[in-house]
Design a protein with these regions (language model features):
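Glycine-rich, often proline-containing surface loops adjacent to acidic residues and nearby aromatics
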Residues: 49-52, 101-107, 135-143, 230
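Non-catalytic C-terminal accessory region of glycerolipid acyltransferases
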Residues: 117-271
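A short alpha->loop->secondary-structure connector
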Residues: 74-82
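Conserved nucleotide-cofactor-binding alpha/beta core module
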Residues: 83-111, 117-118
Length: 271
């Protein structure tokens, strides 16, 4: 009860400065050759988007460190600690869920039947909307799972979940204030694990990862050498959506799937 009551007011800042921040400082020194935050486009416009609370959508390179380094950079420069999503398939140990929830994570439930998946997606979408109405910043990867082959393409299912109960699709997307971010690691410590997974899937299409495999990837991704790391922020896609709708009003008449594909392309172009 104490943790719940003071989660955002007292306990969380202590976690940031007394535990999480020093750990990331050590990891930056031991596992990287430096981390940069860069801007693509109008920096003032990007910072304005950030101040109003942004939905940071990135390509996906590492299970843990993608969100961790973004939090480190945003906390250091803008004193922002984003909420972030993590799949329940990664809870290989009982304590992981409790730790990530304490660090402002929300759980993306990926198992269950069709009806369960729809209900879970609706609940998650409503929770994200609740955070955005409070101008909280959020991180979510553009796809389920890391891009093993480096082909960074936004999965339509992510946008379907985010707008699952929307009447006006484009307005619903604009309310999220999606700011695409590109992540680049000079070295991928999990490259051999990703190659192994692709090979096993090619040899046996029915092969599936175990929770132990995910834990190994998490450990290697945290401790492995990454070289230089660059996070590049881009402006909110809202500006381009407004321009596109003004020039092509017929976009509003497209099917929902076509509208989703249009926004996916915008995000991909930014990343």
């Amino acid at each position: 009860k104490h943790i719940r009551a003071y989660h955002t007011g007292f306990i969380l800042p202590l976690v940031d400065f007394l535990i999480l921040y020093p750990i990331l400082l050590v990891m930056r020194r031991k596992t990287t050759h430096g981390i940069q935050l860069q801007y693509h486009g109008d920096k003032q416009l990007i910072e304005q988007d950030i101040r109003h609370g942004a939905f940071f959508m990135t390509n996906h390179r590492d299970i843990v460190m993608d969100a961790a380094w973004l939090t480190f950079l945003l906390r250091t420069r803008y004193f922002i600690h984003p909420y972030f999503g993590i799949g329940n398939n990664l809870f290989g140990k009982w304590w992981i869920e409790h730790v990530v929830r304490f660090l402002r994570a929300f759980v993306v439930i990926r198992n269950g039947g069709f009806r369960d998946q729809v209900n879970n997606a609706t609940t998650l979408s409503q929770y994200i909307r609740h955070l955005r109405k409070r101008h909280k910043s959020i991180w979510l990867a553009q796809r389920e799972g890391r891009a093993k082959d480096g082909n960074d393409v936004t999965q339509p299912g992510v946008l379907k979940m985010l707008t699952i109960d929307a009447e006006d699709f484009f307005q619903s997307v604009k309310e999220l204030n999606i700011c695409p971010v590109s992540i680049s690691y000079e070295y991928d410590p999990c490259d051999y694990l990703k190659a192994r997974e692709m090979q096993l899937k090619r040899d046996n299409p029915k092969w599936k990862k175990s929770r132990k495999d995910d834990l190994v990837s998490m450990k290697v991704g945290i401790n492995g050498q990454k070289g230089r790391i660059v996070y590049r922020l881009t402006p909110s896609i809202n500006h381009e959506i407004d321009k596109a709708l003004a020039a092509q009003p017929e976009l509003r008449e497209l099917s929902r799937n076509e509208q989703i594909q249009f926004v996916c392309r915008l995000i991909d172009q930014h990343i």
